[in-house]
Amino acid sequence: MNFMKVYEEFLLTLKNMRPDVIIHNPVMFLTEMSLFLSVFIYAFPGFFGVPSSTTYLQFYLAVVILLFLTVFFSSMSTAMSEGKSKAITDSLKKFKTEVTAHVIRDGNPVDVKSTDLRKGDIIVVYRDEIIPIDGEVIEGSGYVDESNVTGESRAVMKVIGDTVTGSTRLVTDKIKIRATADPGSTFIDKMIDLVNRATREKTPNEIALTVFLSGLTLIFLIITASIFSISHYYGRTANVMMLIVLLIALIPTTIGALLPAIGIAAINKVSEYNIIAKSGRAIENAGDIDTIILDKTGTITIGERQAVRMYPNKGVDDKEFYRMCALASFYDQTKEGISILNLARSNGITVSEEDLRGYSFIPFSSETKYSGLESDSDYIIKGSLHALKEKFHVADEFIEALCKEISMRGGTAIPVVHNGKFAGVIELQDLIKPGIKERIAEIKNMDIKTVMCTGDDEVTAQYISAQVGLDEYIANSKPIDKYNVVIREKERQRMVAMVGDGTNDAPALAKADVGLAMNNGTQAAKEAANMIDLDSNPTKLMDVIFLGKQILITRGALTTFSIANDISKYFVIIPAIFYMFPSLSMVNVLDLTDPIVAVTSALIFNTIIIVFLIPLALGGVKYKPTSISDLLKRNIMIYGLGGVVVPFIAIKLIYMLLVALGVVW
């Protein structure tokens, strides 16, 4: 298996060396053209009038080999990155299996192949069966094993309204789903397509750096060609092979060789977090984020609010209030609704559909912020205090004080209104995620503004915000508020990142510079976002920002190191090539007396440094959250100063080794 992987990467390396492929990397294209010219000079030295003694022919052969290895190692780094992308695609393709689906036809289940399903089909899935296609749960509930897609070993509870992904497995109960995609356009199909497309796109910064490197390369090409012309003018014959070595030493081959690999590695590293990025631009944007918009539930808190206590209003019987809560939650298939039913049941109250005859269900929406039951003469509604007061024009000092007390404990108060009066309050509790305070502190240390949007009241929002150290919060938030925050921050020339999972989040996700949609969210949210988290963990937005910073720093660090390398190589190559000018001996700081061995030593270093930097290009520079000024100082010291010192030491050691081995040309 490992041999096949090495063989595939070797073939991919050879493919990347083809001129029609490598031409997209101007620096390495020029290096490859120099290789072809070197082969020609070695084969026909008399054509260019260069020395053709045995000593020089050995030197020419060494140059040919080293230039070949330079191009080979560059192509290999890209092939290794592309190999990882292919592995991700192959792992996703393994999940596409054909299974039998139980489709409802004329009221009865009929077995068909999953490839024959169509969007809108109603399908029954039984315990321990593979879910045949993407869909929405319309009846029943059960735990679904999504480990093959998300990597999460714990089964996830799915209730009415939740989405399920084809190829995952139902491990309990029975559910009925409505297919939301045709075969070939399922979630996994789209993920495969996204991975394939993402690897081929260059980011704006990468394009800008490529243009800069191309311009630098063109300047040095003109300088080298000018030396050839000037030498002829003064009646001297320049050694073309020496000029090729000078050119390769002058141009930024190190970053030129590794730049494509860094770009592809960015997509791969995001995939390691179980996140699919639609483009490299999204990852790059993550490194420049100024404002991050966070949801409270699921991001700052654990996200599994449970009913822990019911408080009846003054004059309302306990059992009667428990019954109201159970009735209002009977058709509420959210985890919160189910927990309210369970709490009522633990207090001896059970209700059935018979008890709801004559009532119609009012589903919860993020706009209204309430749900419940109503009939011609009766209604029981539960929701946020702000929404209920606004809708039903009710007020009660005791209830409001109770809601404030619950909020100050970090809980969520759900008041219940019965026929124009507050009947009581349900208390939900959701714990703050362990470590989230430290993560937010790291975000703020990078000068990133943190804003929390929550549907909870002012007191709860203020409590949570103070607990974790947020810069700003928006209480009683509606989906439009997220969009307004995105617009406001962008008008201030700030780059914005946010998380969303609902259709009403789609406009804000599309407008944000980094929009992270949840895998269990709606199709509209996934299409609007530029990243999708397969684990549906909103906290990962912070990981994406760290990763974006790391990728930008890696590219900058390697560019700094490459250019610093070139400066050092000038002090080796130029005195060696122009040894006939004694005045240049003062810059021969390494005291390399044999010019050809000195040039060869520099070229060997130029080649092997690419190999040593491949792991850094693929893995990224270690990033610790800090201010931009501290980061700049650190990179200049390590990669700037290091880029100058390392070549001096390495080239001197290589020179001494060659001389010790008797390589004296």
UniProtKB/Swiss-Prot annotation:
One of its GO terms (molecular function) is magnesium ion binding. GO terms for cellular component: plasma membrane. Disulfide bonds: none annotated. The active site is at D295. Keywords: ATP-binding, Cell membrane, Ion transport, Magnesium, Membrane, Metal-binding, Nucleotide-binding, Phosphoprotein, Potassium, Potassium transport, Translocase, Transmembrane, Transmembrane helix, Transport. ATP binds at D332, E336, F364, S365, S366, E367, T368, K369, Y370, S371, K382. InterPro entries: ATPase_P-typ_cyto_dom_N, ATPase_P-typ_P_site, ATPase_P-typ_TM_dom_sf, ATPase_P-typ_transduc_dom_A_sf, HAD-like_sf, HAD_sf, P-type_ATPase_bsu_IA, P_typ_ATPase. It comes from the Archaea. Signal peptide: none annotated. Gene3D superfamilies: Calcium-transporting ATPase, cytoplasmic domain N, Calcium-transporting ATPase, cytoplasmic transduction domain A, HAD superfamily/HAD-like. The keyword Cell membrane applies. Part of the high-affinity ATP-driven potassium transport (or Kdp) system, which catalyzes the hydrolysis of ATP coupled with the electrogenic transport of potassium into the cytoplasm. This subunit is responsible for energy coupling to the transport system and for the release of the potassium ions to the cytoplasm. Belongs to the cation transport ATPase (P-type) (TC 3.A.3) family. Type IA subfamily. This is Potassium-transporting ATPase ATP-binding subunit.
